[in-house]
Amino acid sequence: MNDWSIDDARAGYNVTHWSQGFYGISDHGEVTVSPDPKNPDYKIGLNELAKDMVKAGVALPVLVRFPQILHHRVNSLCQAFDQAIQKYEYQADYLLVYPIKVNQQQTVVEEILASQASKEVPQLGLEAGSKPELMAVLAMAQKASSVIVCNGYKDNEYIRLALIGEKLGHKVYIVLEKLSELKMVLAESKRLGVTPRLGLRARLAFQGKGKWQASGGEKSKFGLSAAQILLVVEQLKQNDMLDSLQLLHFHLGSQIANIRDIRQGVSEAGRFYCELRALGASVNCFDVGGGLAVDYDGTRSQSNNSMNYGLTEYANNIVNVLTDICNEYEQPMPRIISESGRYLTAHHAVLITDVIGTEAYQPEDIQPPAEESPQLLHNMWHSWSELSGRADQRALIEIYHDSQSDLQEAHSLFALGQLSLAERAWAEQANLRVCHEVQGLLSAKNRYHRPIIDELNEKLADKFFVNFSLFQSLPDAWGIDQVFPVLPLSGLDKAPERRAVMLDITCDSDGIVDQYVDGQGIETTLPVPAWSADSPYLIGFFLVGAYQEILGDMHNLFGDTNSAVVRIEDNGVTNIESVLAGDTVADVLRYVNLDAVAFMRTYEELVNLHIAKDERAQILEELQVGLKGYTYLEDFS
């Protein structure tokens, strides 16, 4: 493709749409990041950034964080709701609550809180869903508005800690998920002499669509039914504590792709709110939970990896629906709270690593089979001869199917001992040559060709062996088929010569990325520049800032990767602010209760027993360095 342009690359990888303006492709074919929207012309080349970090001693893979993206996401979400409130003359405010389960890393939480440090009245709070998370937010919430929302299942200790938070000066909303939690709250609040701030999680009848739709609906794991909510109201009245009920919460599930689902959920929950007010409850906060989606594939659709709405539309719909319902019931408008963790964090982090090798099919000349060869091989040669003679378009599909059928028969004959290994190898090479030739002759404009084009792209794709663990760094790609944009970090100024799939370095056949953003859709292979052993080849995995770190596991004992915080200064200078070392081999051994110190003693015994004296020190040093080393491959330079 001599007419390839950078615009073709941008469209081919759909960068413009999924990146939200934070990532792009330069005119030189390099992937860049623009972390500071105030200075959009200040860009960082990710390829050069990674090489600089390696020179500074930071081994790949490395997770790179851009805190300025977090700041922008916080402020843009608050601004969207502020504008919607003004537009619809809504008579209350908006509070953004960050659920730290999405990414509990201290750097991430602190940067989110710092995003509104200059505001006189911050619009930020924190959410906890467990006792460890609550202990964290009790220490950090004073940097925000000191609002804490406590979700999740609770025991007496959890409730005591939440009530102690009130004594520490925080505004702590204890959201009741089960009816039994109310009894514990009443007892512990009386014992501590603290008036609790209570919330209810309503179990809506409406259920949104998506991978997390089980979070809503009548069979949801969480929340109270209408009858249970009435019981809570009655028990609070009996204890003269109805004024403590101040918040209504619901959650449709993460990554809600359709704005109509959000409207419908808010509408139903809004009526719960107004009915509670009519019963005398002092509810003044309306917590819509999560659900604000991330457009991972950039298609602006209702797919599980996308969303059919923008930020302004999201805020407008919530404010508009709630305004109308409150006016209908003649009830005061509550403060709106959202827990939009995925939206805040997904874009800020990129995993950068290197391709350590490839397995690629290269067309080879094939010679006709010997005259005495089985007839099957002669049939395959005939198909190839017909194809190389430039068969017409109508015959292409027939030739392809004949070749596939012949290959299956060849495998069957080999299994029966009727085909030699050399004959089987010839049949496989002949089939690959037919596939390669057919692939080049088919046209995507012909709808009958498209399924075969997809099939051949997958069959003939290069295998890129990439220095990372899918299970550690992209667990959702494996566990729930989540799509993450993947890009080579350079060479995009030239037309892609190959299609490839990315395989990790675990000893597991599931360690493969099998979905890729390609234009306005999802494909099973990715168009890429050809790999060369003579030059470094870096790959970026994007939008990995939400959930992936905390969900990652240590399959094959591949641990946490190195990470770095990178900021672009007002003068355009790139500043690598901090680097956090990933797990060493000794670290991951300890995680599974293996004693690295004891192992070292065993090594010494074995070395003394089996190794010559003049080699012992060197061998022991190698073993000790191995225990202290990175769990990933370290040959990139």
From Swiss-Prot:
Which enzyme class?
lyase
Q: Which reaction does it catalyse?
A: L-arginine + H(+) = agmatine + CO2
Q: Per its Swiss-Prot or TrEMBL entry, what cofactor is needed?
A: Mg(2+); pyridoxal 5'-phosphate
The EC number(s) this enzyme carries: 4.1.1.19
What top-level branch of life does the organism fall under? Bacteria
Q: Name one GO molecular function term.
A: metal ion binding
InterPro entries noted in UniProt: Ala_racemase/Decarboxylase_C, Arg_decarb_HB, Arg_decarbox_C, Arg_decrbxlase, De-COase2_N, Orn/DAP/Arg_de-COase, PLP-binding_barrel
- What name appears for this protein in its UniProt entry? Biosynthetic arginine decarboxylase
Q: Which organism is it from?
A: Shewanella baltica (strain OS195)
